[in-house]
Structure formats: structure tokens, C-alpha cells
Amino acid sequence: MPELVELSEHGEVCVVRLRREEKLNALSAEVEGALAEALRDTRLTGSRCVVFTGSERAFSAGADVNEFADLDPAAIAAYYRATGAVYESVADLPQPTIAAISGYCLGGGLELALACDLRVADSTAVFGFPEVGLGILPSSGGTLRVVRIAGPARAKELVLLGERFGAAEARELGLVTEAVAEGEALPRALELGARLAELPALALTTAKQAIDAMPDSSREAGLLLERFAYALLAQTADAEDAVERFGERSGR
């Protein structure tokens, strides 16, 4: 049986590729299990940046609803809880994460992409939340994340109407970091990943975690967190080396 999730190393960047192309990378329970296993792989845990991608036709067309035909509501709810846990694990990875998106990125596929820190989409990308039309709603973190990124009004438009949209509109909404030409999503993601891999790992992780915590923080708590994190990082060898290099360049 072919791998449903394939890992490859590109320098210090780990690429996680969904490999269920014949089903447009639909997220079956098996795929979700393979993705959870990939997140524990040492090739990923030892990397400096992780890129998630699919195929030319689809990043992922979303949950495999055909699996739900023989499931009762409790079993379907359990599936979405498990899927949500996988996506939270993606969001909680200490290193930066990038989604490289071509083709369909719908439902659970879009939820997976939104769990990443950055998203690069090419001109073939098609986004959408079709869940309400199926009698459900995005329930693996997508509703939360689209509100945080696009705001409640646009989130209601996207989720309630379920209309599809392309990379340019996704960029305007903030759902995509960069919109690129056809076939350039993965190369650009790898380029960004290589840049991130050169930066101090602890500073990247701390900045990522601080930013993630800000929406749930009061002004006072957010400022305190920021200053506390700065004080810790300022004592690291990375920070000391950077200050020394700056002094050498400026002749101080």
C-alpha cells in the first residue's frame, strides 16, 4: 500500500506531502492517522521548518465524507475531535510551518492550511468552506482561525455562504501569505523555509508562541509576555552573537 503521507528533507526543511492524489487528498481517518504519525517522525521533529503540501490538483479537498455513511453521530464527532487534535499538533509545532497550496483547498484541507503559520498559494488554488451546505460546520479549528484571521464579518460570509474563492481573494483576506504563479507554491515555500531555517530557532519559536497567545491576552498581559520573552532571549548566545556582529559592521 502506498504511503498516504510522505516525508522528505530539503536541507533543514522537512516537507510533509499528502499522497492520496486519486481522491484529491481527501482526509480519511487513515490519512489523519498517517499525518499524526508523521508529526512524531524524527525527520520532522529535528527540522528547522516544516512545509505541508499536496499535489498539483489538490492540497486537500477536505474530509472524506464517504466514510461517514456508516457512522453514527457519535462516531463522526469522534472523527472530528481526532482531526482537530492533529491540527492542533500542527499549530503547536515549535518550528515555523508553511502550507504550499495548489488546486483544491476545501473544508478540512483549508483547516489544515490555517493551522500553519504561513500559507503560499499558486494561481490554481481554490478555497472554500462547504461544511454548512452539508449540514455541519468547520469543526477542526477552522471556524476559530478564520475569525481570528479575517474577522467575524468575513468569516460569516465565507462559512455561511460556502462560496469558493481563489488565491488573490485569499491574499486580500489574509488567509494566504503570498499568492504566486502556477507551479510556484512549493518552490516559494521551500525558499521561505530555507530563510527561516537560518534564523535563531529559539527566537522563532518564542516569537511564534507569543503571537499565538496575543489574541487571548489582555493588553497588560500581552505586553508583559512580550517583555518577559525579550528578557529571556536577550540572554541567549544567539542574541549576544547578533549584537557582536552588529557592532563589528557599524564599527563600534
Predicted regions and their residues:
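Conserved CoA-thioester-binding segment of acyl-CoA-metabolizing enzymes
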Residues: M1-S55, E88
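Terminal peptide-recognition signature
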Residues: V16, R20, L35, F52, ...
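A short, glycine- and basic residue-enriched loop/turn
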Residues: E21-L24, R57, G62-F68, Y104, ...
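C-terminal alpha-helix plus adjacent terminal tail
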Residues: M1-C14, G162-A168, P187, E191-R252
